[in-house]
Amino acid sequence: MAAGAVFLALSAQLLQARLMKEESPVVSWWLEPEDGTAL
């Protein structure tokens, strides 16, 4: 259930960023990790 909660939190973060058209540090890190690896 923890994984589901994390997934929902990330989805909500991405949705909010799209609606507000602002990039939060979390979204930027999620889409473009500094180490160049995909989660």
Curated annotation (Swiss-Prot):
Main subcellular localisation: secreted
Any single Pfam family the record assigns to this protein: BAGE
- Gene Ontology CC terms, in alphabetical order: extracellular region
* Function, as annotated: Unknown. Candidate gene encoding tumor antigens.
Q: What else is known?
A: The ancestral BAGE gene was generated by juxtacentromeric reshuffling of the KMT2C/MLL3 gene. The BAGE family was expanded by juxtacentromeric movement and/or acrocentric exchanges. BAGE family is composed of expressed genes that map to the juxtacentromeric regions of chromosomes 13 and 21 and of unexpressed gene fragments that scattered in the juxtacentromeric regions of several chromosomes, including chromosomes 9, 13, 18 and 21.
Family membership: Belongs to the BAGE family.
Stated name of the protein: B melanoma antigen 4
* Protein's organism: Homo sapiens
